[in-house]
Amino acid sequence: MSGVCTLVSQKKKPFIGDKKFFEHYGFKVVDTINDYELMALSFETSETPKFSDSARKMEIDSQDFTIYYSNECPYVEYEVKELSDYAKDKGIKLDFIKIDSLDKAKNAPCVFNNWANFYKGKFVSNTILNANAFEKLLK
């Protein structure tokens, strides 16, 4: 496909684009996973983009709290260090998986590759966590 894609949600969620804004500029929903929609603005007739099979799972095998992240946001490395230190101090098992290649992004277990929280194998949120927010999610 020659064009542009974006991720939106059927319900307003943090860090997700506004669907009505993109519809106004001609974007169309081309795929859906749960509440998340892939919108595309095609510049030519070609193959329609879609979410990868791995993203459709929205779950992982690990039962530990696991965060998939990339450096798309300038605060990510700071939060990774803060959470890592916090988990170590509290004796909490916390895994980080950095998405640092195109292959890893294409094979991520959910629609987010900038920050995705999984707990007990299930996708929890895409909110970048600090120590306080992390502690609340564990309760």
Protein language model regions, located:
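Conserved GNAT acetyl-CoA-binding A-motif
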Residues: 1-15
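Structural alpha-beta junctions
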Residues: 1-4, 25-31, 87-94
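Conserved catalytic-core motifs of GNAT/GCN5-like acyltransferases
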Residues: 8, 19, 23-40, 124
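C-terminal "cap" of GNAT-fold acetyltransferases
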Residues: 34-57
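Local sequence-structure signature of Cys/Sec-based thiol-disulfide redox active-site neighborhoods
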Residues: 54-89
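Thiol-based oxidoreductase modules, predominantly thioredoxin-like and allied folds used
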Residues: 91-104
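Structural micro-motif
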Residues: 109-118
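Non-catalytic, surface beta->alpha helical segment in thiol-disulfide oxidoreductase systems
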Residues: 119-139
